[in-house]
Amino acid sequence: MARHHQPRKGSVAFSPRKRAARETPRVKSWPQVDEPGLLALAGYKAGMTHVMMVDNQKNSPTEGMEVSTPVTILEVPPLTVMAVRTYEKTSRGLKTLGEVLATETKDDLRRKLTPPADDYDQEAAIEKIRSNMEYVADVRVIVHTNPRLASVPKKKPEVFECGLGGKTPEEKFEYALEILGKDVRASEIFSEGAFVDAIAVTKGKGFQGPVKRWGIRIQYGKAARSSKGRHIGSLGPWTPSRTMWTVPQAGQMGYHRRTEYNKQILKIGDASEADLVNPDGGFVRYGLVRNDYVMIKGSVPGPTKRLVVLRKAIRAAGKQEEAPQINYISTASKQGV
């Protein structure tokens, strides 16, 4: 019997499905955290492997049993705090009130932007913000990555804005001044077992047809045999006499900025423990992990070498933040897999 109801194919929630404006993702919202500290970390996707761990999820069918779990390895060199930015609240949203720049910067940063001039007065910038602290609504920091330390073929750092934890803007500002110009490691931001949101630009698939892009059904019978099987049955009604934007058509697929919520950190390791996760022959299309790394349960968006921003989970209510016991990490070669 024919079905009376069939939902549309594909979601229009992400339309228009076009290429991301830039490869470094911009974090659009931040969780409210009382403890001072950075709310995000950036790393480069090295690849995937699997581990044998004891399932510690309450009420799980495999609770207390050893299970095989796929994991993603991200190489996370330290982030360098290069500036402090304050915002004031206006009728049109947050507006930049003032900035404090680090006087000493790394040489690689010149590949991305011009550092502060030699006569830049940092103390005057700090005093100007402190005198207007009653107008400050939020404080964030601008950080840059250090790709030279990772196994990615680039030297130019990525620059992005990172939120701060703290109860008041004054507390956030004082903490930001403490870390200004310093490196912050992954172990100072996250702990094992914590939940994070993975934000990245997905793999690019290029120009694809509507069957792969939207998941519509292939035409059957004579329509399929006439070499026109992989297209939609109709572009729309006679009236209105225009094609609606909701009609599934061919176009760009992939290379979109996406957020995946509640990814658990299973392990945080330093450079001395890199051999625990490096497979024989290195990760395919990446190489060997040579710096600090983070092991994430499951997958994250993007191909290898892609920058992934890990933000403290914004929807982590009720999540059990306890690291499971890992009994085995597979280091078998991934070549030809």
Curated annotation (Swiss-Prot):
**BP GO terms, sorted:** translation
Q: Which SUPFAM superfamilies match?
A: Translation proteins
> Which HAMAP family does this entry report, sorted A to Z?
Ribosomal_uL3_A
**Stored PROSITE patterns:** RIBOSOMAL_L3
UniProt xrefs under PANTHER family: 60S RIBOSOMAL PROTEIN L3-RELATED, LARGE RIBOSOMAL SUBUNIT PROTEIN UL3
InterPro entries tied to this protein? L3_arc_euk, Ribosomal_L3_dom_3_arc_sf, Ribosomal_uL3, Ribosomal_uL3_arc, Ribosomal_uL3_CS, Transl_B-barrel_sf
Keywords per UniProt: Ribonucleoprotein, Ribosomal protein, RNA-binding, rRNA-binding
**UniProt region (Disordered), positions on chain:** 1-29
The protein here is known as: Large ribosomal subunit protein uL3
Q: How does it assemble?
A: Part of the 50S ribosomal subunit. Forms a cluster with proteins L14 and L24e.
User: What is the organism field in this record?
Assistant: Methanothermobacter thermautotrophicus (strain ATCC 29096 / DSM 1053 / JCM 10044 / NBRC 100330 / Delta H)
